Amino acid sequence: MTMTITVSIFGQFFPETLLFIPMNLFSIVFALSWIAFIYPTNWAPSRFQSIWASFRANVLEMIFQNTSPNTAPWAGLITTVFIVILSANVLGLFPYAFTATSHISLTYSLGFPIWMAVNILGFYLAFNSRLSHLVPQGTPSALIPLMVWIETLSLFAQPIALGLRLAANLTAGHLLIFLLSTAIWLLSSSLMVSSIPIFVIFVLLFILEIGVACIEAYVFTALVHFYLQQNV
């Protein structure tokens, strides 16, 4: 008797339940509670909190290097966004975990409000200067109406690209992991030796996905800082 199991390739992106607790809720709560844990609340921080403080200082130095002092008040917000995205990305690599940042509903919920706030602040502080960016310097008079439309569209495309880049890269990586792990499972049941090269590729790909999870969190926050630097 042969039993057939049908597995959807996109089924891993649907939230599972553990003890009647939705895994999507668990992953988001874990990412947010992680912030409260890593920030020291006592006079003598622990060894882990000291290591985290050094890591946070290095991240802030990478993101805020060669920047104006006007962006300093935004350091706390950008650092928090980085921690939340990094925690959700890494947590999604665990088996049966829900990758919240692979859904554009979450990535747009993070990117669009920040982009909107930054641009509203930019137009409020320097309205004429922001309008002048819609027409690049040296543009012929005949092309000014066209350039205004192009620059306006590129401006509104920023939050779309910001959220879509994060979700698409994580989705692609998880699909590759799913396909390779399925191939290993099918080959190991028939011929163990043939699954060894695929397993080696799988391990290397998983290590690469850990790096992608960290890099995507950095790219998201670096782009947010870039948009902030254009407006403040």
Swiss-Prot record:
PROSITE patterns: ATPASE_A
InterPro entries (alphabetical): ATP_synth_F0_asu, ATP_synth_F0_asu_AS, ATP_synth_F0_asu_bact/mt, F0_ATP_A_sf
Species per Swiss-Prot/TrEMBL record: Paracentrotus lividus
GO molecular function: proton-transporting ATP synthase activity, rotational mechanism
PANTHER family given in the database record: ATP SYNTHASE SUBUNIT A
Protein name from the UniProt record: ATP synthase subunit a
Key word Manganese present: no
Pfam families for this protein: ATP-synt_A
Topology with respect to the bilayer: Multi-pass membrane protein
Gene giving rise to this polypeptide: ATP6
Subunit structure: F-type ATPases have 2 components, CF(1) - the catalytic core - and CF(0) - the membrane proton channel. CF(1) has five subunits: alpha(3), beta(3), gamma(1), delta(1), epsilon(1). CF(0) has three main subunits: a, b and c.
Family the entry assigns: Belongs to the ATPase A chain family.
CDD domains: ATP-synt_Fo_a_6
Subcellular location as annotated: Mitochondrion inner membrane
